Swiss-Prot record:
Thiamine diphosphate binds at S49, G94, W95, L96, G127, N156, K218, H232, E340, F366, Q402. This is Transketolase-like protein 1. It comes from Macaca fascicularis (Crab-eating macaque). InterPro entries: THDP-binding, Transketo_C/PFOR_II, Transketolase-like, Transketolase-like_Pyr-bd, Transketolase_BS, Transketolase_C, Transketolase_N. SUPFAM superfamilies: Thiamin diphosphate-binding fold (THDP-binding), TK C-terminal domain-like. It catalyses: D-sedoheptulose 7-phosphate + D-glyceraldehyde 3-phosphate = aldehydo-D-ribose 5-phosphate + D-xylulose 5-phosphate. Its EC number is 2.2.1.1.
Amino acid sequence: MADAEASAELPEEARPDGGTLRVLRDMASRLRIHSIRATCSTSSGHPTSCSSSAEIMSVLFFYIMRYKQSDPENPDNDRFVLAKRLSFVDVATGWLGQGLGVACGMAYTGKYFDRASYRVFCLMSDGESSEGSVWEAMAFASYYSLDNLVAIFDVNRLGHSGALPAEHCIDIYQRRCEAFGWNTYVVDGRDVEALCQVFWQASQVKHKPTAVVAKTFKGRGTPSIEDAESWHGKPMPRERADAIIKLIESQIETSRNLDPQLPIEDSPEVNITDVRMTSPPDYRVGDKIATRKACGLALAKLGYANDRVIVLDGDTKYSTFSEIFNKEYPERFIECFMAEQNMVSVALGCASRGRTIAFASTFAAFLTRAFDQIRIGGLSESNINIIGSHCGVSVGEDGASQMALEDIAMFRTIPKCTIFYPTDAVSTEHAVSLAANAKGMCFIRTTRPETMVIYTPQERFEIGQAKVLRHCVSDKVTVIGAGITVYEALAAADELLKQDIFIRVIDLFTIKPLDVTTIISSAKATEGRIITVEDHYPQGGIGEAVCAAVSMDPDIQVHSLAVSGVPQSGKSEELLDMYGISARHIIVAVKCMLLN
């Protein structure tokens, strides 16, 4: 069918008049000028990448998208995610391959939780389609029929270092998108009329996400730079920029502006502040339950307290016990399958604009794969909560590949991230409740084996407050643990007591922030002696965190017990002893400190 015939069959709203088309072209020209000026003024940036997508941006923001300019965080606004190294408000940028996963989370929230009219648009470069996370997101969007999502591939042929593998073979991108179950349009990315039409057509599609594959040219509109290699990420020289700006200005036909369409105001009001459990923990001292199971039970309990609590999992729900939440609230459970990168990105999107309280759970060891997404979540100051189970050598028989021994170090680097490491079921339930109300990212580290409940249901917990479990005026050494190693410290204290050696035992509860006041006061009460014991590698773990906290006090000495080397498979208690973090090793370390 000829383009003219196809255009004639479209309704009037999909066929902007000649005056509107001129304004949209002029808007694209102004966007190019702004990108050139901005990058010249800072001597940094990507003006050629901006230029390739100028018409796309013009059509989206001034003809297609619905939003209130004066209220950019309005819940009814259409969402726009830009992963092309330019700024946007909802998530941090400057990365490649993550934008579509975040957009999936926004679209899923809009379709299934908010049940609202807002739509989600994600602009990507062709270069970032080399990232596997893009295709994780493509599979997710297709599986969940996210027909409120539009992904735009800006196919400008060039990457940072030169031509990309598919260059301008648009049919390759089209076939890939269609193979993933997406409704797909191919369009000339310089043709504002064609762009208006395909974006309108996308709005009519049901049960499928839409991909718009737009053929563009890097540096569009800039003589001798357009479609030229080696200009990626380079501002134009000032003299050349001035000449190019004059050329582009000479092509602008009108000073008229277009106001965006206002959004349809049908998003529900959401209140996710001060979410409280409806009852205290239902455990008795002496009960035995794994903290990973207690976490699953706590999530279900929190879900009852607030209907905006959602849980995502990466095909591990029977091991993380998120299946308990799934059974109670299947409509609020998102199965992300074995795609941890995308799971974290989707969680970021779901939590954006305060629409949900999102918890994402998997084995803590598998989260290393998603560290790039976690890092972006930190830069975005996102309020997502991540649960990592099966931490440390206490995992036991499953072996080293399943044992998270780097996760504390990883999350300690994230700005404003709170790290919970609960010891028993009671403290785990409090960790979940506190995380739901905390600002910034939270990480909850849970343990595989069953452990004994040591706290009463009435015990109160706060972020940054440790628990002193054993203390007396005769204490000689402070032993600091968290999670599984607290039990080893308590066992060591019992054995040393028989030898008239008294130690103070501290359960950190949160590793970040640390309870520095309690640590230092306990150290001073035990003649400056501290032993830390952790089911984690020494690098970046509890020992190093405590050392940093007391580093300004020369009278405090810290000895760290941590896992070293690559662990083997075995029984949990055997491995704790083999790798030097059992009660036996704590006793030896205490006696050595006293001798010195």
